[in-house]
């Protein structure tokens, strides 16, 4: 049933997926409405609950898109191309406005949500942002926060646990999945090897003195630490500057490394799912046990029906990207992972050198917005967008 809010909101966040579906039903009344999605996979998940809506995206044939473009009407579920449809909707809704997929794949550097806001303003129609985790840029908009179930979370401190890329504790949980005939997902930040210099004893990582972003390790020559934001360079230290440990080395297992390590330790079938190659997951979709090792492409893939465990062997690989939005993206990723299985939340296991990071603390507390306000304040202090 539709969930009707007392007044038209500028943003709605939180809740379970089906609650956000109910909110969207409450926002879409009679007449024409435009709903924008970052990806076709998410569009299709919502579309299953809106039989009267019409999809409009690049995955459709040219003749189908052309025919609808000439006479757009009704409730339209679209990717970014929907902004060009020649009609005046009664309202415009942007779903998951913080998604990186809203960045247009061209040299324009355009970002869809601000364009949607401009279109709504020019047409004089209301606009609502609907997402599990709000973008920092829309935090100050008036709206509603739906209650979010507390995640099932286990933080594994890599400064104390042994075993890499999978610790003994995580391996024991994977073997439980194996014994019970369930399914697991193992997520890596990269297809190959990342270049994050981390101390295995204290978790120290070199940061840029100017940008407060992690320095990336480049192997060429004698090696160098480079800031991908401003170009700052420095020599990598031989010992950890914080604790003096010699265990300072590049870390970051890629998909293939993790897959090989698990295949040696488990009798379950281990599948690969990344942007550059995807195994056939049909056996898993039929309910058979197994493990999928992949990148964030898994979030756009099919939902596994018996998913019990989601493991990030090096969660810091997502957190320490050389981009000031990395922590916000990581925060959004973790909450998205809690919804990988419809109806029941899987156990989320994070192997990390920084279990005390504010993103992890917010997830433990079940707080979606509190961390984002901290992030907003930090960006303002550094004059990062949306401050500039």
Spans of features found by a protein language model:
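Inter-lobe coupling/hinge segments of SF2-like helicase ATPases
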Residues: 2-74, 78-388
